Amino acid sequence: MALFANAPRLALYNPLIKSIALVGLGLMNPAQAADEATDEEARLEKVTVISTGIRGAQRTVTESPAPIDIVTSDQLLKTGRADLTEAIAKLLPSFNYGTNVAGYNSTIRPLSNRSLAPAYTLVLVNGKRRHNSALPANGSTDSSGANSVDIDMIPISAVERIEVLKDSAAAQYGSDAIAGVINVILKSGAEGGHLGVTYGKLYSGEGEVTKFEGDTGFELGDGGFLHLSADARKRGDASWNEKATNNAYFPGDPREASWDRVGVKNGDPQIKAFNLAYNAELPLDDQTTLYSYGTYGQRDAIINNYFRYPNGNANIPELFADGYYPLNNLDDTDYQYLIGGKGQALGWNWDLSTTYGRNNNHQYSDRTINPSLGPASPTSFDDLATYRFEQWVNNIDITRAFDGLFGVPLQVSAGLEHRWERFQTFSGDAQAYQVGGYRFPATLPNGQANPLAGQLASIAAQAAAVISPQDTTSLQRNNYAAYVDFGITPIEPLFVDLALRAEHFDDDSGNTVSAKLNSRYEFTDTFAVRGTVGTGFRAPSLTQIGYSISDNRVGAAPDGTIVPAVTRIAPVNSALAQALGATSLDPEKSRNLGFGVTWQPAPRTSLTADAYWIEIADRIARTESLYGPALAPILAAQGVDTSTWTSYYANAFDTRTRGLDIVIDHSSQYGAWGDVRWSAGFNYNKTVIIDVKDAPAALQGLGSNPGGSLTWVGRAREGDLTDAQPKTKWVLGGKWTLGDLGVNLQTTRYGKVKTLQQLESGDRSFGAKWITDLEVSYTLYDNITLSVGGTNIFDVRPDKNAIPSAVGLNLYGNSPFYPGGGFWYSKIAYDF
C-alpha cells in the first residue's frame, strides 16, 4: 500500500502519472484478437535463438535455463541517445547509467548491473571477450580502480541485438562475469542496409548532438558476407552547477561585482567521435567457415573544470589576469580484431579463434598552467599522460551432442583459453609535473600589494592527473583456462547444465576453480521454473595492482566538502603504500543462487521473474584519503610532500546482494487502430556489507591527527557499495504501430539514492524520479522514416545537493539518470 500512498498527489502535480496509467491500462487489457492467435504468436520470443548463457547447442530465450534479456537494434536506435551505454541502461531495469562529471572519467560512464560496478559484468562481442579500457575507474559511484570495457567504442549501427545474461557465469566465461554477461551480436548478411542522421540538443540549449550512422552488407566469395557499419557523432558540452558563493578577486577589487560567479563548468564534455566495424564470414566448404570481425574507434574530448580564481595560488596573474578554466583534452583510440574458423570434424563442432584489442588514451591540455613555474609556465601542454591497455585472447572450443549415451540426450562442450594482457602508463611533459618553487611577489602586476606575497604557488599542471616518471607502470600477465560443460535432459521436462572452469594466472592472482549448475523444469508448454547455484571469481585488474597517480585538483573532506588538495593513489606494491599498510591484492570470490519462473499466461503475453543472491568476498575498493600531521613522518621518509592525501586499493569488504527481476511483455491488436507492444520491467536489489576488514597495524596507534583523517575505509566507501545505486527501478513502455505511423513511449522510475560521507552530517539523499521518453515516427515510401522525439520530456532533474560546495560543484550529486534535463531530437533514416 505504501507504494501507492501518494497517488492522488502525483496525479495532480506530476504529468508522468499519465504515461504510467497509459502503460498500465495496456498491460491489463485483454488481447482482443486472442482467439485468432496462432501457436507461434502465443509464445513471444520463441524464435529468438541465443548463444549466451549455455555452451553447446543454441537455445531460445524461453528455453534458456538462465535469465536472458534481448535488446534489438531497433530498440537501441529508438532511445534517442548516441551512446550504447546509456541506451542499454534506458531499456533494462537491472542496469543503471552513472554520471561522472569531472575530469577524464566523464568520458566513460559506468554501467552498473544489479548494483554491482561495471567490472563485475563481462562484455563479449559475437561471443568473444572484449578488451578493457585503459582508464581506471575513479569516478562518482565507482572508485574501485578497475578498468571496465568501454562499450561506447562499438557503433550502435553495427549491433544486431544484445543478449544480456542476468546470472553469474564465471564458470562458463571466466573472470569478471560475477554479475552477468553482455554479449553484443554484430549485424551480418550480404543484403540490406541503413543510413540515418540525428540532430538534437538539451532544453537548455547546450549539449548539441549531431550523429550520422550507417551499415550495409556485401557478398563475399561463395555464400559469404561482409557487413560494414559506421557511426560519427559530435556533442557539445553542457554543465549543471550552482553559482559560486566565494570571492574570485582580492578585497577591494571592483571586478568582483561583474564576475558571473560561474565557479565550475563540470558536466558533459565536448566530444567528437567515430566508430567503424565489420563482420564477415566465408565458407571454405560444407564443413569449414572462416570468420572475422573488427571495430575501430576514435574519440576526442574537451573537458571543463572548476575555475582557478584570480585570488588563488593556482593562478598566475601575469598569465591570466582574470583567472582561467583549465581544460582536459583526451585523444582516445580503440580497436579490436578477431579471426577464426569453425566447422565439424569427427562428429564434433569446433571453433578456433584469436583476437587482439587495444585502448590508448592520450591526455593533454589546450589551457592550463603549472603555477609553481610562475610567469614562465607554458599555458598549454601537448602531453600530460598516456594510458594503454592491450589484450590478446586465444580460444578453442568443441561441442557435441550425444543422443544415446547413458540412455539420455547429452551435450558435451569443452575448451581452452589463453589470455595475455598488459597495462602501461607513460609520463608527460616534464614542465607539467616539475616543482618550480615559485613564490608570489610582494606586488601584483597592477602595482597593488599582493595578499599572497611569499606564499608558494600550486604544484603541477592544473586540472590534470599528471603522470611523472616515478608514477609510470608496465604490468603484464598471462591467464590459462580450461572448462567443461555438460548439458543433459534426464527426463523430457527437465534440463540440467553443469559447468566447471579452472584458471591459472601467472601473477599473485594464482589459481582458481569455479562451478555452476543450471536447471530448468517445464511443467507445461507455457510455464517453467529455473534455478542456478554457482561460484565465481574476479582477478584484480592490472590497474588496481599497478596504477599510480598524483592529482592536484580536489579532495573530499570527512563532511563531504570539496576542497583543494594534492591527492595520490599509490600502487599496492610500492614502498609508500606498504608503509601505510597495503598488502598484495587477492582475487574476489563469489557465490550465487538464483531461482526464476517463465510464464505465458495468455496468447502474446510473457512473464519472467528471477530472484538472485550474490555474495562477494574480498571486494576491492580504494581506501579513504589518508592525510594529516600524524602521517608526516611516514610521508617524509618516502620522499612525499607531507600535505599529500594518499590512498591505495585493498581487499576491504565482503558484501551480499539480493534482488528480483521481473519482465512482462504483451502484444495487443486493435484492428483498425493498430497494434501495441506493451512492456514492463522491474528490478529490486539491495547490497549490504557483511564484513569490513580491519585497518592495518601501520595506521593504528599513530596518535593525534588534527585536521586530518586516518580512516582506512569508512562510511563514504561503504556508501558507494550500498546506497549509491537505486534499490528499485521500473521501466514501463508501449510501442503503438498504425500502418506507417509509430509511437514509442517509455517511462522509468529510478528509486532514491544516497551519498554517505565519513561524518554523518555530510550525508546527502536524492529522491526517486520518473523520467519519460517519447518518439513519434512515420515511414515514407516504404524505406524513409522521419522521427521526432525527446528523452526526459518533462525536464525532470535530480534533487539538488543539500550541501553544495562554495564553488558550486556537484549540484545534483551522483544521479542514476542523466542530470542534464530534457533532450529533444529529430531523425531521418533510410533503410534498404
Task: Describe the function of each predicted region.
Residues 36, 414, 600, 606, ...:
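Gram-negative outer-membrane beta-barrel transporters
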Residues 48-79, 134-142:
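N-terminal periplasmic "start-of-domain" segments of outer-membrane beta-barrel proteins
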Residues 57-60, 88-133:
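Extracytoplasmic beta-strand/coil segments of soluble accessory domains associated
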Residues 84-87, 91, 111-112, 124, ...:
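N-terminal periplasmic accessory domains that precede
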Residues 128-166, 214:
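Short acidic/polar hinge/loop motifs at secondary-structure boundaries
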Residues 191-194, 204-318, 322, 326-345, ...:
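Transmembrane beta-barrel wall of Gram-negative outer-membrane proteins
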Residues 324-337, 356, 368-494, 694-731:
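Outer-membrane beta-barrel transmembrane domain signature of Gram-negative proteins
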